[in-house]
């Protein structure tokens, strides 16, 4: 089944699943993630550094360049981030690479610096919206894009002790010696230039606008306010006191209730909530309503269409976008594409087809003219741009998009592929599709990171959604796939 479907009109019989993306043993859809020193250990980080430092240096040597590999590193505010930073750096310099440290910063800033300053690759130490005791390693190529699967497969092979590359097997890769041992460079200036870049994208002054920012006690805590202050906003910040254990704790884009309350009680014009590494953004309008990634795609897609700037007349979404978004796009005469879940796949489609905007319901929004990955702070600037250009409140800009009720159930299973492909499950899904017709849709898909099958229905009422979700979930249970 293709990872992308492209549509113009509202649809009947939505494809039941996105393409099952090949997952590695360690790396999932968004890096190597797990509980610190449980699933993801300091030893893993050291070995990732060892491989990347050697591999990119070897690539350069084979192209006649004897200079060391240059690798840029950023991290979140988790307690374990320092441990992983030190062990990654140890591996990199032991293999002869130079490690450049942005210190606490956002994932999109690492992507920006990797691209602009021509690094061989970038590493972000982040578990995004996960709790503090988790962490992760995100790999970014020299173009500021998420790392290709071929390179990731080599990293995994090295972790498992069966690396084969450059025409031979490597039981161990060589250590650098003497003057070939790598250097460690403080590179906070790179983060500061990223802040300057964001400020330069401000089309309008935000003078007099009361903006609330929820930084999730994460990596945007000392970046977002600097940007909004420079553009003239009256900036108010919550959850910007990271202590190593409070990242995403009842804060940020996955716990947006606090920001909703703050906006209403303090008369804010708008609020923006980021996740731990600030690659996603959700908004709160002046009435306290949540503005999701789907709303953002609607608002900015419409804005670009009205200005004649929507190249290919297409907004790129994932299969998890709300049914109502496509109805709204039909009303506007905007085409849309649907990819597998993951901003990586949204970006790949955008690059291949020349699209300017795409993203996910969760708030990963990509503006391909300005960035190579989702960027939460950039997203908030673009929403501010539309508000200022149209001289409208955010609640007014969201009018025209009606969110369909949605029920999503995560079923923990013993074998997610077998459960999803089961003939009885497929028959139940087909029956639901036929009964919903063009009044809703069902989507059944495997999680990319957990032993979970997700069953989601969107329809005109929550009762209808629940009825059809239960129908499919019960078949999964009756056929013996539920774990524990």
Task: Please report, for each region that a protein language model flagged, where it lies by residue.
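Short, Lys/Arg-enriched N-terminal segments with co-localized hydrophobic residues
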Residues: 8-22
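An N-terminal, well-structured beta->alpha segment
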Residues: 19-90, 94-95, 184-211, 417-421
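Gly/Ser/Thr-enriched, mixed-charge loops and adjacent short helices
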Residues: 35, 135-266, 484
